[in-house]
Amino acid sequence: MTPQAFYLALEQAGFALTNHQKEQFDTYFKLLIDWNRKINLTAITEENEVYLKHFYDSVAPLLQGYIPNEPLRLLDIGAGAGFPSIPMKIMFPKLDVTIIDSLNKRIQFLQLLAKELGLEGVHFYHGRAEDFGQDKQFRGQFDLVTARAVARMQILSELTIPFLKIKGKLIALKAQAADQELEEAKKALQLLFAKVLDHQPYQLPNGDARYITLVEKKKETPNKYPRKAGIPNKKPL
């Protein structure tokens, strides 16, 4: 997917980018490739592949109407090189984006990226989701949480749901069918007072299968969740 094909696909979906936004995506690509030589940010480095499998894939929830262009607080867990939240922020500048990542070098890249792109309303924190999820500054403070290929839903729900306001939504992006995952996560979602609202397959323009799962927080998360760092992975709910 060339940059031009990416812009056209967005335009056909009703989202025509400004020249400034196009320049932001171009700068993002160049910085990603430059920094990838120093630290491992992505295995995908060819321009057309980055635009398809990182940029387009990241903004798919916007194209499908899951996120409005409003000043909502969005938290991205384990964003790595900024996916999906930074492409979302470029497209929808009103979003207030927070990223938590466990590798400090990635946070340094994101800080530089935000500066070079001229992004405002972006915040980066180094650490584990389990620790931040018990911090009053973060717990129950977000309208949306995004996670792209982070963990199975059984684990992911414990890492993300505590951050949401009541009626806030988790948007999980996956490359494999999550039907089995959702079945395994039933108990976890019940314990966390969350409910699956939607689970939709879609295709990237090249035909690759992807899945979006939308989960809503119904009540306050019990205080014991999330458990200490590492436990959700070792002993899923």
From Swiss-Prot:
Protein role: Specifically methylates the N7 position of a guanine in 16S rRNA.
Q: Which InterPro entries match?
A: rRNA_ssu_MeTfrase_G, SAM-dependent_MTases_sf
- Spell out the SUPFAM superfamilies in the cross-references: S-adenosyl-L-methionine-dependent methyltransferases (SSF53335)
Similarity-based family: Belongs to the methyltransferase superfamily. RNA methyltransferase RsmG family.
Q: Give this protein's Gene Ontology molecular function annotations.
A: rRNA (guanine-N7-)-methyltransferase activity
Gene Ontology cellular component annotations, sorted alphabetically: cytosol
Q: Which organism is it from?
A: Streptococcus equi subsp. zooepidemicus (strain H70)
Q: Give the signal sequence positions.
A: none
Q: What is this protein identified as?
A: Ribosomal RNA small subunit methyltransferase G
Q: Gene name?
A: rsmG
Q: Which residues bind S-adenosyl-L-methionine?
A: 78, 83, 129-130, 148
Write out the annotated subcellular location: Cytoplasm
Which top-level group of life is the source organism from?
Answer: Bacteria
Pfam families per record = GidB (PF02527)
Major localisation: cytoplasm
Q: What is its EC number?
A: 2.1.1.-
**Keywords annotated in UniProt:** Cytoplasm, Methyltransferase, rRNA processing, S-adenosyl-L-methionine, Transferase
